[in-house]
């Protein structure tokens, strides 16, 4: 008997607050098949899906079968997103390199377009992965009312309400906020690394090397000179009050 999804309380986030937004460069562009009228539009939509799920997809990471089915109308955008989440690239890059809690966090960010409400939500979805498996977790996440109301079958997920008109600065994009590898796996790979480990040395051509009598040689000697510091203390009893200026 599988455990049902545990209940968790939502928190106040921008995605849950209805508001009037003004279109601009900071607002996310919605990619949907409703606006596709040519093959180039399909290319843009597919690349947007790769950026949302993989952040960056190499040529070897592309799912050509899923792309062909999407172009021919055999599957919806929602099915295409499901295929990317269950692909070998996503499993190897995210599922195998993170704990269940962190993997749930990254899936919620990429699929639902928001941050997890709390640790209770991470625990609830992690139990689904442990009891039902990865495929059941992806299906249950895509079948939520939240996903269907915001993206439906034909829209590529995006980070919702990242920028608000009342705030000078928007939220950090998910691909920057949540690195692909967990801290443990980054340490196993040796990150972060110091790229330059040698001392920086100054090179001078022979014609610019200081010769005897050059003032530059005396400059180093002057810098190395130790000048004693003398702290002069003045007692208030030695000050003549008649010398203090005053107003008439």
UniProtKB/Swiss-Prot annotation:
Principal location listed in the UniProt entry: membrane
Record keywords: Antenna complex, Membrane, Photosynthesis, Phycobilisome, Thylakoid
Localization per Swiss-Prot or TrEMBL: Cellular thylakoid membrane
Domain PBS-linker: 11-188
GO cellular component: phycobilisome; plasma membrane-derived thylakoid membrane
Membrane topology: Peripheral membrane protein
Keyword Nucleotidyltransferase: no
GO biological process, one term: photosynthesis
Stated family: Belongs to the phycobilisome linker protein family.
Oligomeric form and interacting partners: The phycobilisome is a hemidiscoidal structure that is composed of two distinct substructures: a core complex and a number of rods radiating from the core.
PANTHER family: PHYCOBILISOME 32.1 KDA LINKER POLYPEPTIDE, PHYCOCYANIN-ASSOCIATED, ROD 2-RELATED (PTHR34011)
Function as written in the Swiss-Prot or TrEMBL entry: Rod-core linker protein required for attachment of phycocyanin to allophycocyanin in cores of phycobilisomes.
Name of the molecule in the record: Phycobilisome rod-core linker polypeptide CpcG
Organism of derivation: Picosynechococcus sp. (strain ATCC 27264 / PCC 7002 / PR-6)
Organism classification: Bacteria, Bacillati, Cyanobacteriota, Cyanophyceae, Oscillatoriophycideae
Protein's gene: cpcG
